[in-house]
Amino acid sequence: MTDLRHYDVIVSPAITEKSTMASENNQVVFNVARKATKPEIKAAVEALFNVKVTGVNTLVRKGKVKRFRGTVGRQSDVKKAIVTLAEGQSIDVATGL
């Protein structure tokens, strides 16, 4: 897989209070492409950040229905990946991709 494809798999780091707490357990949370699979996510993180990944868990957050000036709209679904790193490995997501 090329580096360009790796950048298509990982959209952005998810920086929330919950993901900050997960970093204490050697886990990093990323927003990923909806069609990305666990092996693709693992390969992309290992290639882009030069770390060893021991596990990948994924979830899909369904978009909410929102109203703006009487018009009903819907937010997009978001797929997140919780990546567990090997002992001694770390990624500083604050610096960006």
Swiss-Prot record:
Q: What is the lineage of its organism?
A: Bacteria, Pseudomonadati, Pseudomonadota, Alphaproteobacteria, Hyphomicrobiales
Against SUPFAM superfamilies, the record matches this protein to: Ribosomal proteins S24e, L23 and L15e (SSF54189)
Q: Which organism is it from?
A: Chelativorans sp. (strain BNC1)
Q: What is this protein called?
A: Large ribosomal subunit protein uL23
What family does this belong to? Answer: Belongs to the universal ribosomal protein uL23 family.
What the protein does? One of the early assembly proteins it binds 23S rRNA. One of the proteins that surrounds the polypeptide exit tunnel on the outside of the ribosome. Forms the main docking site for trigger factor binding to the ribosome.
Q: How does it assemble?
A: Part of the 50S ribosomal subunit. Contacts protein L29, and trigger factor when it is bound to the ribosome.
Instruction: Name the UniProt key words of this record, in alphabetical order.
Output: Ribonucleoprotein, Ribosomal protein, RNA-binding, rRNA-binding
What NCBIfam families does the record tag this protein with? PRK05738.1-3, PRK05738.1-5, PRK05738.2-4
Q: What GO molecular function annotations does the UniProt record carry, in alphabetical order?
A: rRNA binding; structural constituent of ribosome
Q: Looking at the keywords, is Heme present?
A: no
Please give the superkingdom of this protein's source. Bacteria
Question: Which InterPro entries does the entry link to?
Answer: Nucleotide-bd_a/b_plait_sf (IPR012677), Ribosomal_uL23-like (IPR013025), Ribosomal_uL23/eL15/eS24_sf (IPR012678)
Q: Which gene encodes it?
A: rplW
User: What are the BP-aspect GO terms?
Assistant: translation
Cellular component GO terms, alphabetical:
ribonucleoprotein complex; ribosome
Pfam families cross-referenced by the UniProt entry = Ribosomal_L23 (PF00276)
Q: Does the keyword Ribosomal protein apply?
A: yes
